Regions:
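Short, conserved beta-strand element in jelly-roll/cupin
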Residues: 23-39, 55
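Regular secondary-structure segments
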Residues: 33, 116-130, 177, 181-184, ...
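All-alpha amphipathic helical-bundle segments outside canonical DNA-binding/catalytic cores
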Residues: 126-143
């Protein structure tokens, strides 16, 4: 896999919406600087507030839906594991996964300036990159992850923490999403799942979109495409 390091800081108005869930073959560190959003990741939806960082693993489906604030500000870093190889070597890959994968890190106010300083260095370096820049990216990114371990309370993105993390996620929608994740390769219809959950199909359709920010059919197709892409990457299967 090709080496990758990208960093971006952007401000959105309240009308902005991500069109669809997506995944990629590299890691992403997502920092919500201002505003609030619902973060769909893997097969659950979580509430994120300003000052929270989420570590998104490679090949994991995710999507943000911003809530009704005046504006939202977010920063993300996309990177491959060669930029954090020293940290992985020290922790071991399994410990690294347990520490970071799909974890939410809440940055304490008294340490926020340290994180912002690192982000500022990385943004400036990316805008004025040269032959030495990869060394700067690697050193500061690993330092950033170390600070997350040392200073931040974190919660794994799991069903056990779901109630604490997002208040609007409806149990019936979570059950539907879990069912799709397990049965995406079968014929599935909205009416079938609504009946399984003892819900009116129209009500279920509206609830599904309200929780996730995208419709039932879009979610089902995205899950199928994501699994197909992973099969192509990880096996000798072809599309023919």
């Amino acid at each position: 896999m090709a080496s990758r390091f990208e960093i971006s800081q952007q401000i959105y108005n309240s009308a902005y919406a991500m069109h669809s869930a997506h995944s990629h073959s590299y890691y992403e560190l997502y920092y919500l600087m201002n505003g609030s959003c619902n973060m769909f990741i893997h097969d659950n939806t979580y509430r994120m507030e300003a000052g929270t960082i989420l570590f998104i693993p490679d090949n994991v489906l995710h999507k943000t839906t911003y809530l009704n604030n005046a504006y939202h500000e977010r920063l993300y870093i996309e990177f491959t594991d060669d930029y954090i190889s020293d940290l992985i070597d020290i922790l071991g890959f399994e410990q690294f996964k347990d520490t970071f994968y799909m974890h939410f890190f809440s940055i304490p106010d008294n340490h926020r300036h340290e994180f912002l300083s690192i982000f500022s260095v990385l943004i400036n370096e990316r805008q004025n990159s040269n032959a030495l820049s990869p060394c700067v990216y690697k050193n500061h990114l690993q330092n950033l992850l170390i600070l997350l371990c040392r200073y931040c309370d974190n919660k794994p993105a799991s069903p056990a923490s779901l109630v604490d993390t997002v208040s609007i996620a409806d149990v019936s929608v979570q059950k539907a999403m879990n069912y799709i994740m397990l049965n995406y390769n079968k014929d599935i219809t909205l009416d079938e799942i609504a009946d399984m959950l003892h819900l009116n199909p129209s009500y279920f359709s509206k609830k599904f979109k309200a929780v996730n920010g995208f419709g039932f059919k879009e979610y089902l197709n995205t899950i199928r495409i994501n699994h197909s892409e992973q099969l192509l990457l990880e096996t000798d299967m072809s599309i023919t």
